[in-house]
């Protein structure tokens, strides 16, 4: 009986300690990547706004077959919602310099994906930023797993921005 009490007390203290340490990790995580592109915001938004184009530049969709993607809520010929194997992606807002989409996977919290085009006065290039916002619960396993987000999402975001850069700059050179 003493051994059982010791085990229960030890597990409880360990859980409380791990939970207390996890509270040092923020509840809001933003992963962000940026690159300079020799293009106008319009040329960048042509790639980002059209969900049909995402398979061409977004590495998160490079291995997805077209028959697993369902588009809906079309406005001006461009879908506003995309479903990929149960994951829903929907445009939340499109401002002049920032576009935000919500990615919702069943059983998980929504992830905000945002793209910004930042113009520089006197420059022929813009900075394109892609960010992902994660809002975490207090659960220790969620908090500690967030430490791996940078390594799992960051390189793919860089690759995606590189693809956008190539496509937007290629569009620009084909017009000149």
Question: Over which residues does each language-model region extend?
Answer:
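Glycine-rich portal/gate segments that line the openings of hydrophobic small-molecule binding cavities
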Residues: 4-8, 42, 49, 53-59, ...
